[in-house]
Regions:
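Short acidic/histidine-rich motifs immediately flanking catalytic phosphotransfer sites
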Residues: 77-81
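Membrane-proximal helix-turn-helix segments that form the acceptor-binding/catalytic region
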Residues: 70, 101-106, 122-138
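A short, histidine- and acid-enriched strand-loop-helix "catalytic/donor-clamping" loop
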Residues: 87-91, 108-125, 138
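Glycine-rich, highly charged phosphate/nucleotide-binding loops
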Residues: 61-74
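N-terminal subdomain of nucleotide-sugar transferases
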Residues: 2-54
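An aromatic- and histidine-rich active-site surface loop
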Residues: 82-106
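Donor nucleotide-sugar binding/catalytic pocket of nucleotide-sugar-dependent glycosyltransferases
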Residues: 134-169
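A short helix->loop->beta-strand "cap" motif at the edges of active sites that frequently abuts
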Residues: 106-109, 158-160
Length: 169
């Protein structure tokens, strides 16, 4: 075993709470999370998928969100990193807000993974979205053009940004 790998395995063990759409949901975030779950990094980083959003009636959505937040109260403390898979819409961000607050109270690293870059143009006046970006430790985007757009449209957001081109590589 290489020395660097040994150091990484012993001293850099991280556990990641992955927050996003429910397994039972449909759409891009669920598709990405299903793919990530099959990758070696999922096991290496001891990831746990906490589904917060589900399609259906308002009652069903609210009940699902409540259960996820309640579950987070008990499990978030076991994780070092909380990785939010989200879009700029206020509804999804509002549902995930209590978990972000818990992460901040627990001094966890918070990653905001923005899945729908083409919505960046439509949310420049969305103060809640801007607030979210400013309170995360890293913002992940799926393409360099979204990184450029984010930097251009949201100059007030100083949070470090990275691009993940293809999580499968």
């Amino acid at each position: 075993m290489r020395f660097r790998q040994l150091i990484e395995d012993v001293f850099m063990k991280h556990r990641v709470l992955v927050v996003g759409a429910a397994r039972e949901s449909t759409g891009g975030v669920t598709t990405v999370l299903n793919l990530c779950e099959k990758m070696p990094m999922w096991k290496k980083w001891q990831c746990y998928w906490l589904g917060t959003q589900l399609h259906g009636s308002y009652g069903r959505k609210a009940w699902y969100a409540f259960k996820a937040i309640f579950r987070a109260i008990f499990i978030i403390w076991k994780y070092d990193i909380v990785h939010f898979h989200t879009t700029p819409d206020k509804g999804g961000l509002l549902i995930q807000l209590p978990i972000l607050i818990m992460a901040k109270i627990g001094r966890k690293k918070a990653i905001m993974h923005i899945h729908v870059g083409n919505q960046l143009n439509d949310n420049t006046e969305n103060k809640f979205f801007i607030w979210w970006m400013q309170h995360c430790d890293v913002i992940v985007l799926l393409a360099k053009k979204w990184l450029n757009l984010l930097s251009q449209k949201y100059p007030q957001v100083k949070t470090p940004k990275v691009v993940v081109y293809n999580a499968c590589e």
